């Protein structure tokens, strides 16, 4: 899918389809298209695509636990628990959500 620089800005982007309901409180629903800016770093609070230590990608909010002194991935649905893992790699940061009408 070609993405307009005037809408999305410069950089390398890709689109993925959200699967599941773990991000519903961030207004990301099952089946939504998510525009991801490809980058290896992110800020706390960003919604990121992260590859976990088991090789799977997940879309979650990046947070930091001051007591544990570690980053974790936070689902935006209270039915799911935070993901504390030893290692994960940021694959990109969500920039836009595209919803079907």
Where are these regions (language model features)?
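Acidic/glycine-rich C-terminal interaction modules and beta/coil loop segments
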Residues: 1-101
């Amino acid at each position: 899918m070609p993405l307009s620089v005037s809408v999305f800005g410069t950089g390398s982007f890709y689109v993925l389809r959200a699967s599941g309901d773990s991000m519903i409180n961030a207004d990301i629903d099952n089946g939504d298209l998510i525009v991801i800016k490809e980058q290896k770093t992110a800020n706390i609070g960003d919604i990121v695509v992260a590859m976990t230590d088991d090789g799977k990608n997940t879309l979650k909010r990046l947070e930091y636990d001051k007591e544990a002194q570690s980053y974790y991935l936070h689902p935006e649905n209270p039915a799911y628990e935070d993901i504390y893992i030893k290692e994960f790699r940021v694959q990109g940061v969500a920039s836009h959500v595209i919803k079907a009408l």
